[in-house]
Regions:
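A mature extracytoplasmic/lumenal domain signature
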Residues: 162, 178, 187-191, 216, ...
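Hydrophobic-ligand binding "helix-grip"
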Residues: 158, 166-167, 171-209
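A short acidic/glycine-rich loop-to-helix N-cap element
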Residues: 196-201, 227-246
Length: 262
């Protein structure tokens, strides 16, 4: 009898210790796009204006709902998407420890200071954020150390002050969401953004999203910027080009941060 009782217990332990189920890359991105992502040297990108809709959005229920909610409330006239793949080391399991460590890398917003992107107008690399810091609130703006979490929260809200060499010194909210196979964050501007003296994006009119989805042997990274841009001739094109290259800079930053986890 003692032996028969131990067998179910061993089976239960084996089940508990298994990593959470993740959809395959083919299921998330489609077979053709998955094949492109596996061999692409650069992220796949899409830029749309006027009446945009997602074209690169992975088939992931939570992410699809999040993007639909943002689109419904914002009604963007600019939608910039990028999709790329991060190949995990063989030893990586996407277990709870790795997820917590990855979240802590993503909430280290001070590390965004100094990252570079390619400026289409200047035809050279340029600093994206000159400064970046977590703050206590949009009102007080007191700088805080990057937060570190010992457990994985379902959601959390951070505020940040970031000085952008193109759009100036602005305050943002960062909403993070986590689940068995994903970590998402959405950055929203809480102050109006100007390109010099030219109004570019009004308050709460930019939502930038980064979604990290486990797909077994890799992580699928979806980044999107949805914006309601000012009605200034040429502004949509200018911001579209800028945001595409900025998204690539964020993906490079993510790759470097993920390298410290896996």
């Amino acid at each position: 009898m003692a032996r028969s009782k131990r067998v179910p217990l061993l089976i239960l332990c084996a089940v508990v210790m298994q990593p959470a189920f993740s959809a395959s890359l083919d299921e998330l991105a489609g077979t053709e796009r998955a094949a492109v992502l596996r061999t692409a040297a650069e992220p796949v990108t899409e830029v749309q204006q006027k009446n945009p809709r997602p074209r690169l959005l992975p088939r992931h229920g939570e992410l699809e709902r999040l993007v639909a909610d943002i689109q419904s409330s914002l009604e963007p006239n600019l939608f910039v998407e990028t999709l790329s793949l991060y190949q995990k080391p063989r030893a990586a399991d996407w277990d709870n420890v790795e997820q917590i460590n990855l979240l802590n890398q993503l909430t280290a917003l001070s590390t965004l200071a100094g990252i570079q992107y390619y400026s289409e107008s200047r035809k050279t690399m340029r600093t994206f954020y000159e400064t970046s810091a977590v703050i206590d609130s949009p009102a007080k703006k007191t700088p805080l150390p990057d937060p570190v979490y010992a457990a994985l929260p379902n959601s959390l809200l951070l505020y940040a002050r970031q000085k952008d060499l193109t759009f100036g010194d602005n305050i943002y909210s960062f909403n993070f969401y986590t689940g068995e196979d994903y970590i998402f964050f959405v950055q929203e501007n809480l102050t109006a953004m100007n390109a010099g003296i030219i109004p570019a994006i009004g308050k709460n009119k930019l939502h930038s999203l980064v979604a990290v989805i486990d797909s077994g042997d890799s992580l699928l990274i979806y980044a999107a910027a949805m914006a309601k841009t000012a009605s200034v001739p040429g502004m949509g094109d200018r911001i579209g080009h800028s945001f595409t290259n900025r998204a690539k800079a964020i993906l490079k930053w993510f790759t470097e941060r993920a390298g410290g986890v896996f």
